[in-house]
């Protein structure tokens, strides 16, 4: 017998004997074992919570240290610090959406709950002046809004970047490799929180989430910061893009059009970053191509189809149009990548799909035609260049 297996069996036997000998008289061995397991699980949960609190404090200390180094190393004149302190905090307060699209009115109880929720976000999401970065001293502060400190730090970093014209920020981030990892770690944790929220987005929709997506897009759009962020967070960004896509397609609730609007707008905001736009366009076209194939099979067999998915696909068309128009406006049509497999498949089957589905699904084929025009125009513009 293997030595490791022998030790494992011996340990299990010793543990079983210890439980049998120490169990109370009014409990069976199984009941006592389950009781001990529950106590151990509770203890592990407590330690896990303590570790999370300590990790959050360490992260905030790292953020504060990075900002202090940047300010002391690059802005000794005090100009930037005074400028930042003179600025009002960025608006991350919660703005509750009205329910005009739902056709429903809010009861007094719901209005009270909405008011309480609004007050909660105003207190927990509005970034304070930076520095100093407040340390988390209570577990409830983390549980209420674990993302607010990351938002505050990243927004402050963008303010530093915007006020710096000499390029000192780039030199500092290159010099302090460990400090640059602080930015990546903050982005990673912010993405984790965003993914958790967008997996099941609900009204009222706080402005905090849309601002968080905008902050991410701005950070990744920055040439000096993007390399550090993408190096660690590329997989997490892909997961976030897919989460937004699934949040749109998987929404089958009645009168939840505002959720669709906000999630779609978040996807557009993320796609405004040129470094992410190509992957988002490819992801959207992949879904459109797959849905067109499904509709083709349904049309031939005269079978039923998922009405919710059919309605939701038009939000993807809207996002696609916004991103393709943005690409054309910026003159970056060559970056769309017509060698992309999903773009190739879309253009190759475009006319045939419209011809086959135009009678049964006229609205779908109309939007298919619109996206095809935008892609073809971008392709012609690329060939001209």
Swiss-Prot record:
GO annotation terms (biological process): DNA recombination; homologous chromosome pairing at meiosis; meiotic DNA double-strand break formation; oogenesis; spermatogenesis
Biased composition (Polar residues): 92-107
Keyword field contains Disulfide bond: no
GO cellular component terms, semicolon-separated: chromosome; lateral element
One Pfam family of this chain: Mei4
Coiled coil: none
Keyword set, alphabetical order: Chromosome, DNA recombination, Meiosis
UniProt keyword Chaperone present: no
Stored InterPro entries: MEI4 (IPR025888)
Region: Disordered, residue numbers: 86-110
Region described as Interaction with REC114: spans on this chain: 1-126
Record localization: Chromosome
Domain of life of the organism encoding this protein: Eukaryota
Complexes and interactors: Part of the MCD recombinosome complex, at least composed of IHO1, REC114 and MEI4. Forms a complex with REC114; the interaction is required for MEI4 stability. Interacts (via N-terminal domain) with REC114 (via C-terminal domain). Interacts with IHO1.
Functional description taken from the UniProt entry: Required for DNA double-strand breaks (DSBs) formation in unsynapsed regions during meiotic recombination. Probably acts by forming a complex with IHO1 and REC114, which activates DSBs formation in unsynapsed regions, an essential step to ensure completion of synapsis.
Family: Belongs to the MEI4L family.
Descriptive protein name: Meiosis-specific protein MEI4
């Amino acid at each position: 017998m293997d030595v490791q297996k022998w030790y494992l069996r011996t340990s299990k036997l010793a543990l079983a004997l210890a439980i049998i000998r120490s169990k109370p008289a009014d409990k069976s061995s199984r009941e006592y074992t389950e009781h001990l397991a529950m106590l151990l699980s509770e203890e592990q949960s407590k330690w896990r919570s303590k570790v999370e609190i300590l990790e959050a404090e360490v992260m905030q200390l790292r953020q504060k240290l990075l900002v202090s180094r940047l300010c002391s190393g690059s802005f000794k004149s005090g100009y930037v610090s005074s400028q930042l302190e003179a600025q009002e905090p960025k608006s991350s307060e919660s703005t509750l959406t009205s329910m005009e699209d739902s056709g429903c009115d809010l009861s007094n109880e719901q209005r009270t709950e909405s008011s309480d929720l609004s007050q909660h976000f105003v207190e927990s999401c509005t970034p304070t002046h930076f520095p100093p970065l407040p340390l988390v001293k209570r577990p409830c502060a983390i549980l209420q809004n674990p993302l607010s400190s990351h938002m505050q730090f990243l927004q402050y970093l963008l303010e530093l970047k915007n006020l710096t014209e000499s390029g000192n920020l780039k030199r500092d981030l290159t010099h302090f490799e460990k400090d640059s990892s602080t930015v990546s770690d903050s982005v990673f944790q912010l993405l984790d929180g965003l993914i958790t929220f967008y997996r099941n987005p609900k009204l009222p929709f706080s402005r905090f989430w849309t601002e968080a997506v905008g902050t991410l897009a701005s950070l990744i759009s920055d040439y000096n910061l993007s390399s550090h962020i993408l190096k660690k967070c590329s997989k997490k960004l892909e997961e976030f893009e897919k989460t937004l896509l699934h949040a749109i397609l998987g929404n089958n609730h009645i009168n939840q059009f505002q959720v669709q609007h906000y999630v779609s707008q978040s996807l557009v905001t993320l796609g405004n970053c040129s470094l992410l736009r190509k992957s988002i366009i490819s992801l959207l076209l992949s879904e459109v191509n797959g849905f067109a194939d499904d509709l083709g099979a349904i049309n031939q067999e005269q079978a039923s189809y998922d009405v919710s998915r059919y309605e939701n696909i038009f939000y993807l068309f809207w996002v696609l149009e916004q991103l393709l128009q943005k690409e054309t406006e910026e003159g970056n049509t060559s970056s769309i990548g017509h060698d992309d497999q999903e773009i190739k498949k879309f253009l190759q089957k475009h006319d045939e799909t419209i011809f086959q589905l135009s009678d049964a699904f006229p609205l779908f084929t109309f939007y298919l035609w619109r996206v095809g025009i935008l892609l073809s125009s971008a392709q012609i513009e690329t060939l001209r260049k």
